[in-house]
């Protein structure tokens, strides 16, 4: 199975070109064809020799993904199901924001973090995506606009799809390098956000990288007892260890951290939890921001329901009065399989049902 050419960073593409006995500038030409002109085959790279094109075809594919289901929401959100070369499935989401076009990418097939409210956790981790498979999600969504002759470009990326990005650390870092490269898609690092669940040692590593990508942490509870009950990762990385790493990140990078807090009715959305959260954040108040997220119900997690508006507003008001920076996140795609992992899980469930029906007609 040949890898995608998108698996190469600009640097490793230069190294590959030199290994083929070509001049280094050929890497820039290939890079421009891929990310500026966004061709779909090596044959379209008309300023390359036939010999180099043959080597590219022999060793790489351009696009490693096949497009499957596409769901479009009334609010402009588009959810894609892509098939990987080994037949496994992933999902990607396009969101039309007031500030531009934002794409949410997946980094793993399935997820082992096991958050008890999340559809992604219903799909056990099968493998990591390589850099090329993550980059290809962006390129295929951009193709959606290119083919329509629309002069629109993806401007923002959120790494919040299925999987824990820092459990696939090196591939995710190479994805950032590729998509941020100023000779390619040139999506600014500050327009990219990576959302993680709390691998504290990786937060420290990320701080030392000097990458300008925004960091978001899935917190969802203000104390260890509650967080451990809904996020099993907290048993390995309790809040004390997590916040020590976050404080190191803030001190090292001088950058703000966003905390994601999903609102689960009568679980974590009370005024008492808002007060606990304010206390937890008091030492990093000026360097933190809280995203209050309305819950998209998942039928397999029917122990949870969406917080009523009045409870969300009471939580928000309490946090604001204590000096917290927070916002209630705008919803997208509520009329489709909107929750992370929901489209993929529902597709897999339907496929299983069809298989059972075929065996037991």
Curated annotation (Swiss-Prot):
Location within or outside the cell: Cytoplasm
Record-annotated active site: 91, 340
One example GO MF annotation: metal ion binding
Alphabetical list of Gene3D superfamilies matching this protein: 1.10.150.530, Aldolase class I
EC number: 2.1.1.192
Main location: cytoplasm
Keywords associated with the record: 4Fe-4S, Cytoplasm, Disulfide bond, Iron, Iron-sulfur, Metal-binding, Methyltransferase, rRNA processing, S-adenosyl-L-methionine, Transferase, tRNA processing
Superkingdom assignment: Bacteria
PANTHER family given in the database record: 23S RRNA METHYLTRANSFERASE, RADICAL SAM CORE DOMAIN-CONTAINING PROTEIN
Function: Specifically methylates position 2 of adenine 2503 in 23S rRNA and position 2 of adenine 37 in tRNAs.
Name of the protein in question: Probable dual-specificity RNA methyltransferase RlmN
Species of provenance: Streptococcus pneumoniae (strain P1031)
């Amino acid at each position: 199975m040949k890898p995608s050419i998108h698996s190469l960073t600009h640097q490793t593409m230069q190294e590959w070109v030199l290994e083929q006995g070509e001049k280094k500038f050929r890497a820039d030409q290939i890079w421009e064809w891929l990310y500026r002109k966004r061709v779909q085959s090596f044959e379209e790279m008309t300023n390359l020799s036939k010999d180099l094109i043959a080597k590219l075809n022999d060793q790489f594919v351009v696009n490693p993904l096949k497009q499957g289901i596409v769901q479009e929401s009334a609010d402009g959100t588009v959810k894609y199901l892509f098939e990987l070369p080994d037949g496994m499935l992933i999902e990607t989401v396009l969101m039309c924001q007031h500030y531009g076009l934002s794409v949410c990418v997946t980094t793993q097939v399935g997820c082992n973090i096991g958050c008890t409210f999340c559809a992604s956790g219903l799909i056990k981790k099968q493998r990591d995506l390589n850099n090329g498979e993550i980059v290809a999600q962006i390129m295929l969504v951009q193709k959606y606009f290119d083919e329509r002759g629309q002069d629109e470009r993806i401007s923002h990326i959120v790494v919040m799809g299925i999987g824990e990005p820092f459990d696939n650390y090196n591939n995710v870092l190479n994805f950032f390098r590729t998509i941020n490269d100023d000779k390619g898609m040139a999506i600014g690092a500050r327009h990219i956000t990576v959302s993680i669940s709390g691998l504290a040692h990786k937060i420290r590593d990320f701080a030392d990288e000097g990458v300008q990508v925004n960091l978001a942490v899935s917190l969802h509870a203000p104390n260890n007892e509650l967080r451990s009950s809904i996020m099993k990762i907290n048993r390995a990385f309790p809040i004390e260890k997590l916040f020590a790493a976050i404080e190191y990140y803030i001190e090292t990078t001088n950058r703000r951290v966003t905390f994601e807090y999903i609102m689960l009715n009568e679980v974590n959305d009370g005024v008492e939890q808002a007060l606990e959260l304010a206390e937890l954040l008091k030492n990093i108040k000026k360097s933190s921001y809280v995203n209050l997220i309305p819950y998209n119900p998942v039928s397999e997690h029917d122990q949870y329901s969406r917080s009523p508006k009045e409870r969300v507003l009471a939580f928000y008001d309490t946090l604001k009065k204590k000096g917290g920076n927070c916002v209630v996140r705008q919803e997208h795609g509520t009329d489709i399989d909107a929750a992370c992992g929901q489209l993929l899980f529902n597709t897999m469930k339907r496929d299983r049902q069809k298989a059972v029906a075929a065996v037991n007609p």
